[in-house]
Amino acid sequence: MQASMLDSQWRLTIFSPRRKVKVSQMNSRFIAVLLTATILPWVAQAQDSYPSSPVTIMVPAAAGGPSDTVARLVAQSMSKTLGQQVLVENMGGAGGSLGAANVAKADPDGYRLLLYHIGVATFAALYPNLAYKPIEDFSSVGLITEVPMTIVGRKDLEPKTFADLVAIVKKNATTVTFGTAGTGAVSDLCGRLLQDALGTKITLVPYKGMGPAMTDLIGGRIDLACDQTTNTTTQIKANEVHAYAVTTKARIDVLPDVPTVDEGGLKDFELSAWHALWAPKDTPAPIREKLSEALKTALKDPMVIERFASLGTVPVAQDMATPAALDQKFKAEVERLAKVISEAGK
């Protein structure tokens, strides 16, 4: 009987609800410790060996455009530093937001990156129903370059100076056609900023990329366009279009005879198509730092510098090709451009 009581007492102790909780807590702690001991070294090893396979840079625009050109130059140089191929993939649509969504949903392992321009900073304002949030859902790697924009016109357009163009556009705004690469594209931003500076509305004509827009401009079917010098310099030098102004504070070396917008009488008008590199959110800091270092090396590569110069741009300073610098720039541009888009009424 005594043994039976002891046995009963033992069972009550072991299988009482309180004891179950204690055993469960002990098991949970043990599992947590075990997982930490096994997973953390694996994660650290994965980060140390990164990259162990090819890296893909997503350009959310058609091949052959300015962003694609920048991406392929940078990818070629980064491949040497990382010891793995850096591939470029193109996915256009919705002003770049579709390709960006592809990266936002990717695994945060550093193998799928986004390279695009200032347009990323417009997505939240232009597409309020996006399935992702640009600031929250991307991890910054670094800035790459700030490409000047050039306002160009069909070569038979009557005014030949930017000041004369401004005067004529103000008088005939509704009849002036301005080609863009679509809502949210940097060319579209240029058109919106021009409207704001002129204090009038012009007819913005959206195309599926700047290629078709430039074709129509050269063919005389639209009056004006605004695109990155990486895309317009060849046409300007071939006398296929007329260059009116660059959208930076100073003239640029590759087009020294083209005045600035400010020189033409529009004050406080400045726009550059800065390009940058992002990874999906939660990408580990060591991986982003490794990517940033490879990016910095690419921006010092003589081949990249020479090719950028021929396109009318230069790499950013080394301290700008960092996650922190891009974070600051990106947040400021999102705020600035949201106001521009709101005032333009989309």
Swiss-Prot record:
| Protein localization | Periplasm
Recorded hits in Gene3D superfamilies, A to Z, give: Bordetella uptake gene, domain 1, Periplasmic binding protein-like II
Alphabetic keyword roster = Periplasm, Plasmid, Signal
User: Predominant location of this chain?
Assistant: periplasm
Q: Which domain of life is it from?
A: Bacteria
Q: Which GO terms describe its cellular component?
A: periplasmic space
Signal peptide residues on this chain, from the entry's feature table: 1-46
Keyword Signal appears in the UniProt entry: yes
Protein family (similarity comment)? Belongs to the UPF0065 (bug) family.
In terms of PANTHER family, this protein maps to: BLR1237 PROTEIN, TRICARBOXYLATE-BINDING PROTEIN
Q: What is this protein called?
A: UPF0065 protein in the TAR-I ttuE-ttuC' intergenic region
Species, as recorded: Agrobacterium vitis
